[in-house]
Amino acid sequence: MAFAPSHTASPSYCGVAQGGRRSNGMSPVVAMASTINRVKTAKKPYTPPREVHLQVKHSLPPQKREIFDSLQPWAKENLLNLLKPVEKSWQPQDFLPDPSSDGFYDEVKELRERAKEIPDDYFVCLVGDMVTEEALPTYQTMLNTLDGVRDETGASPTTWAVWTRAWTAEENRHGDLLNKYMYLTGRVDMKQIEKTIQYLIGSGMDPGTENNPYLGFLYTSFQERATFISHGNTARHAKEYGDLKLAQICGTIAADEKRHETAYTKIVEKLFEIDPDYTVLAFADMMRKKISMPAHLMYDGKDDNLFEHFSAVAQRLGVYTARDYADILEFLVQRWKVADLTGLSGEGRRAQDFVCTLAPRIRRLDERAQARAKQAPVIPFSWVYDRKVQL
């Protein structure tokens, strides 16, 4: 979740240009609806508030699909053991006041007293994290767009499908827990948050993965580490504000994200082992397009730039920053030993050089941007009852 440089159009490694993330222009569907409305023959159909008009589909060469079929036994041995049995997993209720307890109201009162000490800008970051987690239907859908690894039936016994469903089930607890905690604090406008979640799921996401599992697993590797960092930082902040229970909540979620990061980075590590040239080209492609955050189409019905504003607050508080983005890239380059790859094609060597030298360039650009930065404006956030928060 959180801050990432804005997406810009760039050619992919398979030779097809990538488009922008969103458009405020009128789509053909909307234009047709407007014509219909003028003659009063029908209502305007639903359209998502954020639409992506230029998308690339099915860039994976057919012969590459066989790789993922052959990796089924490997995936069973190396991925499924990273999942926790349900009976041994934590559940949201483990961290919340027990509604059947005589002390329930006292526990809620204590929770609300602790929450009073937490500033609005922190809640903006926490809500943004929670909204991102709550859009889980979109992320399962995204994984099931990937050729060669999707769940073909909804209950497929293939290892890839079992992993995706179980991963989704584990992730589902994150949004549930943060949502219930937020509700009990009384500090945030739950209806505005709920609207934001509905808008976001309706808009979907555009990660630029092109139905291609190479791109998809590179994306999830980056994202799981990003969410691990973000939740870890919100845990640290909560502890500083004196809310040890909230710190425990965020830290527990961060630990899940770290385990999921391990799984996805293992997949990409295996792809580098068996198909290094195509994998490094895919890595460079994703980094040229820039890793968009899962909630980049966020909207609350009011703020057309809600994601950018939320990201700016997260950057200022140190919850998730441009430096984190560069650090994640550097971590993955080292984790996958990209600099040590040999036997690459000419295009592969250029891709290798690009990803291995990108992190320092991102840091330099960020340092220049910070040096030029002016006093950030203060704007209202609907999530905290339109109270103003500095970006």
Swiss-Prot record:
<dbReference type="GO" id="GO:0006633">
    <property type="term" value="P:fatty acid biosynthetic process"/>
</dbReference>
<comment type="subunit">
    <text>Homodimer.</text>
</comment>
<feature type="binding site">
    <location>
        <position position="257"/>
    </location>
    <ligand>
        <name>Fe cation 1</name>
    </ligand>
</feature>
<feature type="binding site">
    <location>
        <position position="260"/>
    </location>
    <ligand>
        <name>Fe cation 2</name>
    </ligand>
</feature>
<feature type="transit peptide" description="Chloroplast">
    <location>
        <begin position="1"/>
        <end position="32"/>
    </location>
</feature>
<comment type="similarity">
    <text>Belongs to the fatty acid desaturase type 2 family.</text>
</comment>
<keyword id="KW-0809">Transit peptide</keyword>
<keyword id="KW-0150">Chloroplast</keyword>
<comment type="function">
    <text>Converts stearoyl-ACP to oleoyl-ACP by introduction of a cis double bond between carbons 9 and 10 of the acyl chain.</text>
</comment>
<feature type="binding site">
    <location>
        <position position="171"/>
    </location>
    <ligand>
        <name>Fe cation 2</name>
    </ligand>
</feature>
<dbReference type="InterPro" id="IPR005067">
    <property type="entry name" value="Fatty_acid_desaturase-2"/>
</dbReference>
<protein>
    <recommendedName>
        <fullName>Stearoyl-[acyl-carrier-protein] 9-desaturase 5, chloroplastic</fullName>
        <ecNumber>1.14.19.2</ecNumber>
    </recommendedName>
</protein>
<dbReference type="InterPro" id="IPR009078">
    <property type="entry name" value="Ferritin-like_SF"/>
</dbReference>
<keyword id="KW-0934">Plastid</keyword>
<feature type="binding site">
    <location>
        <position position="224"/>
    </location>
    <ligand>
        <name>Fe cation 2</name>
    </ligand>
</feature>
<keyword id="KW-0560">Oxidoreductase</keyword>
<keyword id="KW-0276">Fatty acid metabolism</keyword>
<feature type="binding site">
    <location>
        <position position="174"/>
    </location>
    <ligand>
        <name>Fe cation 1</name>
    </ligand>
</feature>
<dbReference type="Pfam" id="PF03405">
    <property type="entry name" value="FA_desaturase_2"/>
</dbReference>
<keyword id="KW-0444">Lipid biosynthesis</keyword>
<dbReference type="InterPro" id="IPR012348">
    <property type="entry name" value="RNR-like"/>
</dbReference>
<dbReference type="InterPro" id="IPR005803">
    <property type="entry name" value="FADS-2_CS"/>
</dbReference>
<feature type="binding site">
    <location>
        <position position="257"/>
    </location>
    <ligand>
        <name>Fe cation 2</name>
    </ligand>
</feature>
<dbReference type="GO" id="GO:0009570">
    <property type="term" value="C:chloroplast stroma"/>
</dbReference>
<feature type="binding site">
    <location>
        <position position="133"/>
    </location>
    <ligand>
        <name>Fe cation 1</name>
    </ligand>
</feature>
<comment type="pathway">
    <text>Lipid metabolism; fatty acid metabolism.</text>
</comment>
<keyword id="KW-0275">Fatty acid biosynthesis</keyword>
<keyword id="KW-0408">Iron</keyword>
<keyword id="KW-0479">Metal-binding</keyword>
<feature type="binding site">
    <location>
        <position position="171"/>
    </location>
    <ligand>
        <name>Fe cation 1</name>
    </ligand>
</feature>
<keyword id="KW-0443">Lipid metabolism</keyword>
<dbReference type="GO" id="GO:0046872">
    <property type="term" value="F:metal ion binding"/>
</dbReference>
<feature type="region of interest" description="Disordered">
    <location>
        <begin position="1"/>
        <end position="20"/>
    </location>
</feature>
<dbReference type="GO" id="GO:0045300">
    <property type="term" value="F:stearoyl-[ACP] desaturase activity"/>
</dbReference>
